[in-house]
C-alpha cells in the first residue's frame, strides 16, 4: 500500500512546517485532524481545503472540500463544496507538487499550504499517520 508524504506550511510563516506521512485512502476529515494535531491545535473548528492558493481568493476555488458539506442535516447552507468525510486524499492529490490551501477556523483564518512531496511504500513497522518532521515552533492557537 502506498503512503503520501506532505509538507504543510503556515501560509504567512512559511519557515514553520510539518511533514506528514499518511495513507492516500484516508479521508480529508482524518487528514485535517492530523494537520491540526501536528501544530498542537485543538480540532474544534470548521475547515476546508481549496485549490486556489492565493490566500484571499480561496472561496473562488474550482475545487473545494469543506466540513460544511457534511453538515447539511444540521441546517447548514450548501457552499458548493464537496464532502471532507467522503473524499479521500488520493482523490485530491494525484502528482508530486500538487498543492491545496487548508483553512482551519473560519474566525481566526489559520491558513496552510499542503503540498504533496512524495510517495512511499507502507512500512509494517510504522504506525500511520506519522509526523515525519517538524521545523519551527508552532504558534499558539489562541492568544489568551
Ranges and model annotations:
Residues 1-144:
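Short linear regulatory motifs enriched in tryptophan with gly/pro/ser
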Amino acid at each position: 500500500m502506498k503512503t503520501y508524504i506532505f509538507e504543510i506550511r503556515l501560509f504567512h510563516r512559511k519557515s514553520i512546517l510539518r511533514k506528514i506521512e499518511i495513507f492516500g485512502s484516508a479521508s480529508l476529515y482524518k487528514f485535517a485532524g492530523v494537520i491540526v494535531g501536528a501544530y498542537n491545535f485543538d480540532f474544534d473548528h470548521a475547515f476546508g481545503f481549496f485549490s486556489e492558493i492565493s490566500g484571499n481568493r480561496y472561496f473562488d476555488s474550482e475545487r473545494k472540500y469543506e466540513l460544511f458539506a457534511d453538515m447539511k442535516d444540521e441546517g447548514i447552507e450548501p457552499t458548493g463544496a464537496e464532502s471532507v468525510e467522503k473524499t479521500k486524499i488520493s482523490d485530491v492529490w494525484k502528482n508530486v507538487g500538487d498543492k491545496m490551501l487548508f483553512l482551519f477556523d473560519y474566525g481566526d483564518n489559520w491558513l496552510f499550504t499542503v503540498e504533496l512531496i512524495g510517495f512511499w511504500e507502507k512500512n509494517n513497522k510504522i504506525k500511520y499517520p506519522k509526523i515525519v518532521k517538524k521545523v519551527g515552533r508552532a504558534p499558539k492557537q489562541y492568544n489568551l
